[in-house]
Amino acid sequence: VGNGIVLAGGALLAGHVAVEDKAIISGNCVVHQFCRIGKLSMMRGLSRTSRDVPPFCIMDETHTVKSLNLIGLRRHGMDAKRVRALKNAFLILFRGGLNMQNALEQVETEVELTEDVTELLDFIKASKRGVCFGEGTDVSEFV
């Protein structure tokens, strides 16, 4: 468990879950064993996941990345240039309609590789359980 996290009432973390710095796990969220919750991410109340929650993102419902955690990023002093680079990466990774491998390659060639973007890409590449899906992703092939 990282530093500065928020773990609200009723949140359930199974064994070997890793929660990175400044992550927020809202009330009554459920996290499957061996999952990772990324830095400055947020799980909305009543969410559940058996996949990794990427850093800097808001996760909702089941395995669904809704958006960047823009309020959290600003509260922690991230400037507009860093947020813009993350937003560009986010749009390709979670809204671009590409499979994750192609999306990673596109981000590496088209987006400014700031420290934050590199951290996001490294987190996704290191995932053993897979990361949460972008909103609107056809998940039928994964079920």
Predicted regions and their residues:
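Left-handed beta-helix
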Residues: 2-3, 8-15, 20-21, 26-33, ...
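Terminal amphipathic alpha-helical/low-complexity segments used for targeting or macromolecular assembly
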Residues: 55-56, 62-143
